[in-house]
Amino acid sequence: MTKPIIHETANQPQAFFWLLILILVQFLFYFKMQIDGYFYTKNQCDEPRRRAWSSFEVAIPPGYAVHGIDVSHYSCKIDWEEVKRMNSNGIQMHFAYMRATRGLNLVDYQFSESWQTAEEAHILRGAYHFYMFRDNPVDQARFFLSHVPIKSGDLPPVLDIENDLDVNDRKLNRDNILKDIAAWLYIVEKQTGMRPMIYTNLDYYKYYIEGNFPAYTIWIASYKSKGTVVLPDNRHWSFWQFSDKARCNGISERIDLNVFAGTIEQLYALRKK
């Protein structure tokens, strides 16, 4: 006798249900970690802290006339007048970049205040977006633009490409990632009338940027390089983040310190007209 064919589908809805539960738990855990870290930093920043230093406390690469910082909510509340006044062995801060947004759901809670008060202190300012590989690039661009009121005198917007937790899972989709990055850059340039810059570290530069986006200004992060930093394809860089351990008056936390490979006049020329 031929046995009847039995389709064992009874367990499929149950398996799908538990898969959804697993995905939801992972998402909630990730979201909780982000929120906990965010409010832990915010609570720390609410405490009074020392914001006066005798020097930058890091070795400054010689031969560069223009210096600046980049900050986020991890830098806590900033006294931009003190940042402007600091002078250590003739070195002053000429520009500051501030994280505005990350991915699709995080607006840096210090951004709005820093954006305004840095301008009042007559520090050249710029905003950057921390790119998340798993999020839609078009939506990320619109999210960034909706929170950054770029106007005449501001430095170009920056796309920060680094250390996304998901990047190792998506390396097989490198071509898609490059298309996504290009989409973000295109939308922001079209909306602001300014060509964005690309910030990245040497590892991400080698994997994603080398040989791509030749028309875009490069801001490279490298803490081990001495004197200067050389990109693997010898491409010119315009900004170099050489330390993440610097001190600066007006800021309680250690910060990122940068040099600009040009004159102050060339930096001014980058501003929005």
Whereabouts are the PLM-identified features?
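Hydrophobic membrane-insertion alpha-helices, especially the h-region
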Residues: 14-34
